[in-house]
Each structure stands twice: as structure tokens, then as C-alpha cells.
Curated annotation (Swiss-Prot):
SUPFAM superfamilies: LDH C-terminal domain-like, NAD(P)-binding Rossmann-fold domains
Protein name (record): L-lactate dehydrogenase A chain
Catalytic activity: (S)-lactate + NAD(+) = pyruvate + NADH + H(+)
Family annotation (PANTHER family): L-2-HYDROXYCARBOXYLATE DEHYDROGENASE (NAD(P)(+)), L-LACTATE DEHYDROGENASE A CHAIN
Active-site residue numbers: H192 (proton acceptor)
Gene from which the chain derives: ldha
Length: 331
């Protein structure tokens, strides 16, 4: 008899039971690992699968996390073969060519489209009913690419979008007012990145409109220069990349925030990237961030946000820029 047989007596033969809320992270780079640890520490799934083409790096990261299993409640698996991702509830795609210092997100695009042509069909093969969350940049275009390549309905393909931009915005407003970001309600919509749109008309604390107190807020004529806060949001990622070489922690936490709303069916409103054709005067098939309700089925509803004419014009301009790139893509 083996030690195990001496220690344990079987009462019944267990039938293999699949995971109820499995999450997969594709890509074990800085963003993938920050997303993985954020998901693990929030205890969001009973199984976390990780997949990447770089076998040694993947194996090392998975082992490193598994060594912490005592402190977690989640089974951690990893392989370069996508069969390890089978029956995932949510698949988070962080893989792709990394943005170089000074490189615009749009510049990355065709490099990443080619990577997606391998990734997306594999996800669909093993998790045909999953909710697909795209994090790789440029996120709005790649969410469109993932939607096209997957054949999924639009409510099951979500881009992480401006969830992080809005978090940065709320943090900076909070710094200026000496308040916690959760008490500063503010939204950034449109493109994740350089042409994102701050909705100054909606910024409020405890229901008090800040633009009601300072009608010039967000304009050139504002003596308090609130506009600089949005510039800081846009420059924030470039600044972090310049200082440490990449961004990871905040986007990882943002991803876990979105995964939580889906897995726990919270019906929470997030600014995420979705198909906005027909909204805010957008005519083309583009994905941009607007406030959306996230739950177990994915993206269930879109909130009709009241935008001022100038804000709406900026959203349309973003859409035109993205469509200009998208129509050149070889899918």
C-alpha cells in the first residue's frame, strides 16, 4: 500500500466536474500577469488558465503562482496549447506586440492583428460561449478585430476601453479636491488613449455638478485649469512607460474590476469599448467606450449619456480616425 492509500480511504469515485467560473488570461507579459494576480487576489474564479507562445516564460510564471497556492483558493493551470483554456467563462486577451516609448497606440495595430488571427480562433474553438475581453492595444480597433474574427454576438466581445482612463481621471480629480476617487464621479468616453473625451458636464461629487459651480471647467478660459487633468490622464501611460518601461498594475486592477462585474453578475456600469454604430452620430462599424452595464451574459445594456455638442463632435472625430485605420486592415 502507498502512503496515500494508508492515509486516505475512498468513499466514492468522484465524477470530474468542470469549473463553474473559469477565467483565462492570454499573454503572460506585464499586463497579463498584473491581470492574473489581481483576479486571483479578488478570488473571482475557481480556475485560472494562462496561455502564451513563449513556453519557458509561461511555465515560470505559472509555477511561481502555483507556489502561492496555499494562500489562494483558485486552481492555476497553464499551457501553450489552448485546450487548457476549455470552457472558460471569461477570456482576457492581453497578448500582443508591446507599445514602445513614444509609439502611438494606433501604430501598433497591424502587428497585433496578425497575432489575433492565431489567438481568436483558438479561443472560439475551446470556449465557444465565453465572454471575450480585449485589453491589447490599440484596444478599440483590436476589439473590433476580435469581434470580426470570433463571429461572436456584440454583447460577448468587450474592450477594456476607458475603464482605466476614467479611473485615472477620478484619481486626479480626487487629488485636486482631497477626496477619495470613489466619491468623484467622472467619465471618459471615446477612444482609449490620445483622443479620449472627458465628459466635464457629468463630473460631480455627491450629485453636485462641478461645471455648475465652475461653468468654464474643462475649457481654455478656466482659471483653475481643470483641462490639465485630462492632459495628465492622456500623458499618464506615456509617463509611466518612460519611467518604468511599461504599464501594468493599474490596467491589471482595471481588468479584475471588469471581470468581477461579469462573474458576479453585478450589473455595474463601466466605460468599456463596444460597437457604437448608430450612437452619438457615429455611422461606421467602430468600437468606442460608452457607459455599459456588465453582467453574467456580458454587456447587457448601454447607458444613453447626455453629451454636449462639442463632446459629441470629439467622439465622432475619434470614430473617423479609427475607421480610417480599420478599413485598411487585412483581416
Amino acid at each position: 500500500m502507498s502512503t496515500k492509500e494508508k492515509l486516505i480511504s475512498h468513499v466514492m469515485k468522484e465524477e470530474p466536474v468542470g469549473s463553474r467560473n473559469k477565467v483565462t488570461v492570454v499573454g503572460v507579459g506585464m499586463v497579463g500577469m498584473a491581470s492574473a494576480i489581481s483576479i486571483l487576489l479578488k478570488d473571482l474564479c475557481d480556475e485560472l488558465a494562462m496561455v502564451d507562445v513563449m513556453e519557458d516564460k509561461l511555465k515560470g510564471e505559472v509555477m511561481d503562482l502555483q507556489h502561492g497556492s496555499l494562500f489562494l483558493k483558485t486552481k492555476i493551470v497553464g499551457d501553450k496549447d489552448y485546450s487548457v483554456t476549455a470552457n472558460s467563462k471569461v477570456v482576457v486577451v492581453t497578448a500582443g506586440a508591446r507599445q514602445q516609448e513614444g509609439e502611438s497606440r494606433l501604430n501598433l495595430v497591424q502587428r497585433n492583428v496578425n497575432i489575433f488571427k492565431f489567438i481568436i480562433p483558438n479561443i472560439v474553438k475551446y470556449s465557444p460561449n465565453c465572454i471575450l475581453m480585449v485589453v491589447s492595444n490599440p484596444v478599440d480597433i483590436l476589439t473590433y478585430v476580435a469581434w470580426k474574427l470570433s463571429g461572436f454576438p456584440r454583447h460577448r466581445v468587450i474592450g477594456s476601453g476607458t475603464n482605466l482612463d476614467s479611473a485615472r481621471f477620478r484619481h486626479l480629480i480626487g487629488e485636486k479636491l482631497h477626496l477619495h476617487p470613489s466619491s468623484c464621479h467622472a467619465w471618459i468616453v471615446g477612444e482609449h488613449g490620445d483622443s479620449s473625451v472627458p465628459v466635464w458636464s457629468g463630473v460631480n461629487v455627491a450629485g453636485v455638478s462641478l461645471q455648475g459651480l465652475n461653468p468654464q471647467m474643462g475649457t481654455e478660459g478656466d482659471g483653475e485649469d481643470w483641462k490639465a487633468i485630462h492632459k495628465e490622464v492622456v500623458d499618464g501611460a506615456y509617463e509611466v512607460i518612460k519611467l518604468k518601461g511599461y504599464t501594468s498594475w493599474a490596467i491589471g486592477m482595471s481588468v479584475a474590476d471588469l471581470v468581477e462585474s461579469i462573474i458576479k453578475n453585478m450589473h455595474k456600469v463601466h466605460p468599456v469599448s463596444t460597437l457604437v454604430q448608430g450612437m452619438h452620430g457615429v455611422k461606421d462599424e467602430v468600437f468606442l467606450s460608452v457607459p455599459c452595464v456588465l453582467g453574467n451574459s456580458g454587456l447587457t445594456d448601454v447607458i444613453h449619456m447626455t453629451l454636449k455638442a462639442e463632446e459629441e463632435k470629439q467622439v465622432q472625430k475619434s470614430a473617423e480616425t479609427l475607421w480610417g485605420v480599420q478599413k485598411e486592415l487585412i483581416l
